[in-house]
């Protein structure tokens, strides 16, 4: 049974001006009467935007430090705009939005967005904070509701549209909305993507927020290009820096950290998906780990309406995903970067070199999985609550698969058969576990928020099965992998009506392995050519037996299947 809507005083429902009152126009948040979280904000100012001044900029820190900064705002006038000092060597150049030609007509665009969703704007915002926000906390709920309570015209158009777009995915989960006709999401998407390019010229934190939310859409296009753009914007905003001691509101410090790590995750998972080098590197990344105080909401803020997401579980999930993504970044750097490829090629033994690099990451992954909080286990579901933990477990399997994918690629006819057996057995265990995971998904998992990479990660399981298939060392093994791949493809196909992203995942998988399976089906499976298949595998030839091979103890952990 749905709980009655909370009163405005608890910050859970937006306060709007009465029908006869005009919207409150806020030129500068510092001039707001009464209490406001936004009074000293750096990254979400109204009618102004701020760009970080880097260490090699024409405005040298020593020269900037000589300027007179007022005590209230830590600002000093500039020839154009103003400078703001937030730390000993951290300065921002602030400009007026009006100086940008793209600013004209923004109010009309915001009004158009509201007309598209009218009269359901408030209900959609409640729906977004019920289902999406707990598992992907890149907004500040009270700040968002404070602004919306005054007027929708305080928002950046792409952010306002993006929140509505994602909320529309759960339209039927609101008893208030389910009885009404659904707004045209295509119109909202057109506005969101077009205005995102406009506001990128005068970017704020809301620009990155909008971009990240749009990238969570199941059918988002040009994701790599947009991700690249968001990383550049994030650097303009100083998101790559440690803001712990900056002179900005404490809520904004937490928001910046959450947003920075969300950007890091977007960049890393996009790099995996599209086979590109990540833009963000450890060398120029000073963001501190998120801690409890960086998340302003708690269980007390949780919505009790059926079909909501648990707030504290979402916070734990987000933190765990950050930790996992750091390990994925290490996999990409140590096993797939151009530098790593060159070093491995120049090594005496390619497989041994790969295993040496993989071992410490594998141990970290095993420890991460073993130490996973109970709240994030697949069976830790509550009646009437959606659970997004599925995307975390899927991301774990994708990371494991990416690691073992590189190991399998290193194997050749010259690799000792015993080492081949060890490596392939470990890869097989990961594949079976990943496929079994899919069968454990419940409706409360499938209907929740899923991270953008999930559709690709589901397809990656099938791609890995295809790799195991074509690198098989015996016909029996080849038939096993062919059968499992066919079963997985079928299961994904018949399940794709459960969620939109599964339908997309099914299409991605078909593109990746459809031709392979068609070719394998068109001929006798024992006549199919496998590069790793040795002639002696069928006739019992023992010429390559491993009687003189003694794998070093450092690779012994591969004997442990480490099934989750």
Question: Predicted regions span which residues?
Answer:
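Intrinsically disordered, low-complexity activation-like regions
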Residues: 5-131, 166, 322-352
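Fungal C-terminal regulatory tails
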Residues: 13, 19-79, 91, 106, ...
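Extended, leucine-rich alpha-helical cores of fungal transcription factors
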Residues: 110-122, 143-161, 182-283, 307-367, ...
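Non-membrane alpha-helical segments in proteins
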Residues: 126, 130, 158-176, 209-217
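Eukaryotic beta-rich interaction modules
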Residues: 135-145
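Elongated alpha-helical scaffolds that mediate protein-protein interactions in large eukaryotic proteins
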Residues: 176-182
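Short, flexible helix-coil linker/hinge segments at the edges of structured domains or between repeats
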Residues: 279-304
């Amino acid at each position: 049974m749905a709980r009655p809507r909370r009163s405005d005083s608890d910050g859970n429902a937006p306060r709007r001006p009465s029908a006869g009152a005009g919207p409150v126009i806020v030129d500068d948040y510092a001039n707001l009467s009464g209490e406001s979280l936004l009074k000293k904000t750096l990254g979400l100012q109204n009618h102004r935007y701020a760009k970080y001044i880097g260490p090699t900029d024409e405005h040298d820190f020593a020269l900037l430090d000589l300027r007179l900064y007022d005590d209230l705002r830590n600002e000093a006038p500039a020839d154009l705009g103003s400078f703001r000092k937030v730390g000993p060597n951290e300065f921002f150049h602030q400009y007026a939005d009006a100086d940008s030609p793209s600013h004209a007509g923004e109010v009309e665009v915001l009004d158009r967005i509201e007309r598209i969703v009218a009269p359901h704007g408030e209900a959609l915002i409640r729906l977004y904070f019920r289902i999406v926000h707990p598992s992907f906390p890149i907004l500040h709920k009270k700040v968002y509701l404070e602004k919306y309570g005054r007027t929708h015209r305080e928002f950046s158009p792409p952010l306002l549209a993006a929140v509505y777009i994602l909320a529309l995915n759960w339209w039927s989960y609101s008893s208030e909305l389910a009885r009404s006709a659904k707004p045209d999401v295509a119109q909202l998407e057109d506005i969101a993507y077009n205005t995102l390019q406009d506001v990128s010229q005068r970017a704020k934190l809301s620009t990155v927020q909008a971009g990240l939310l749009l990238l969570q859409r199941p059918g988002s296009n040009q994701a790599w290009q947009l991700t690249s753009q968001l990383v550049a914007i994030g650097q303009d905003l100083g998101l790559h820096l440690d803001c712990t001691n900056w002179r900005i509101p404490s809520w904004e410090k937490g928001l910046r950290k959450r947003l920075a790590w969300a950007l890091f995750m977007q960049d890393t998972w996009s790099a995996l998906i599209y086979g590109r080098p990540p833009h963000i590197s450890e060398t120029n990344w000073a963001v501190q780990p998120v801690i409890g105080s960086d998340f302003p909401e708690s269980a007390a803020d949780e919505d009790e309406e059926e079909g909501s997401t648990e707030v504290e579980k979402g916070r734990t999930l987000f933190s765990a995903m950050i930790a996992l993504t750091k390990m994925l970044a290490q996999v990409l750097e140590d096993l797939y970067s151009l530098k790593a490829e060159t070093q491995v090629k120049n090594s005496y033994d390619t497989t041994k070199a790969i295993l040496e690099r993989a071992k410490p990451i594998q141990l970290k992954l095993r420890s991460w999985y073993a130490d996973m909080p109970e709240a994030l286990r697949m069976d830790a579901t509550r009646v009437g609550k959606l659970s997004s933990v599925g995307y975390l477990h899927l991301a774990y399997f994708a990371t494991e698969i990416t690691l073992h994918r590189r190991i399998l690629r290193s194997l050749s006819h010259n690799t000792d058969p015993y080492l081949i057996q060890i490596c392939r057995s470990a890869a097989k265990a990961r594949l079976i576990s990943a496929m079994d995971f899919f069968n454990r998904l419940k409706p409360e998992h499938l209907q929740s928020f899923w991270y953008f990479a999930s559709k690709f990660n589901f397809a990656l399981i099938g791609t890995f099965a295809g790799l195991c298939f074509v690198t098989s060392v015996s016909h029996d093994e080849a038939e096993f992998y062919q059968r499992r791949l066919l079963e997985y493809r079928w299961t994904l196909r018949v399940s794709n009506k459960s969620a939109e992203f599964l339908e997309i995942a099914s299409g991605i998988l078909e593109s990746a392995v459809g031709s392979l399976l068609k070719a394998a089906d068109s001929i006798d499976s024992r006549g199919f050519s496998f590069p790793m298949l040795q002639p002696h595998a069928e006739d019992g030839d023992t010429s390559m037996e491993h009687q003189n091979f003694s794998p070093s103890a450092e690779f012994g952990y591969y004997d442990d299947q480490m099934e989750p």
